[in-house]
Amino acid sequence: MIGTANVLEVCKDLGISDRIIEFSTSEVFGSMAFKSKEEDQTVAGSAGEARWVYAVSKLAGEHLAKAYGKEYNLPIVTIRPFNVYGPGQSANGALQIFIERALRGEDIHIDGDGNQIRAWCYVDDFVDCIMSCITNPKAIGESFNIGNPRAVITILGLAQTICRVLNSKSKIVFEPPLSADVAIRIPSVEKAKEVLGFSSKIDLEEGILKTAKHIQDKWKVTETVN
């Protein structure tokens, strides 16, 4: 939030007139986000739950960006990513962890019963939409959900699909549920489709294969260097 404030202040002082992309999060919709639209009510989550600190900070950033946009006529565009994955993803993302463990034949651990539902968006589709946010003048002043509502699957189903697609013998192990988890997270991307012409192209299985290849290639480079 402080970082967002600093960036906005600098943009104001420099008179930025091209485009300012403010990255928010789908977490602002809380623990139940079914086909959430940009104008739907956002939530702050329960005070004291560490998970929601991130969502609250991002939501505060959204409000601040909107205020700067109106007050100083800054070309703000807010995006809310929904479960983006693919090459370059941080090592603590569920899909990344599942693929790495499947490639190694290690147990895949799931928090809770695995019935949590997610919609997975491949990074190339995500970047395409960001580029539209940068270049399309109609995007200025708007917020957009970016995700793939066609790639919907439970966490258990995701683990099973990864094992099948990668021909892995990994076992799925269930762990105690997290104290604060999101039961369902599926975006509505109708606004991005209408305004930006956005449509995700990479289905889940293709995305899994592309991500797995990237991981394997990275491992090969590491082995060569070592």
What do the predicted segments below correspond to?
Residues I130-I134, A159-I162, I208-I215:
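Hydrophobic "lid"/C-terminal helical patch
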Residues M1-E9, D13, D18-R19, E27-T78, ...:
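Catalytic helix-loop patch of NAD(P)-dependent Rossmann-fold dehydrogenases
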Residues A33, L59, P75, V84-I97, ...:
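Glycine/proline-rich active-site loop of Rossmann-fold NAD(P)-dependent oxidoreductases
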Residues E190, L204-N226:
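Amphipathic terminal alpha-helices
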Residues S24-T25, R80-Y85:
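Conserved SDR Rossmann-fold cofactor-binding beta-strand/turn motif
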Residues D113-N115, G141-N145, I153-A159, N167-I184, ...:
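C-terminal "lid/loop" region of Rossmann-like NAD(P)-dependent oxidoreductases
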Residues F126, I130, I146, L158, ...:
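Non-catalytic, hydrophobic alpha-helical segments
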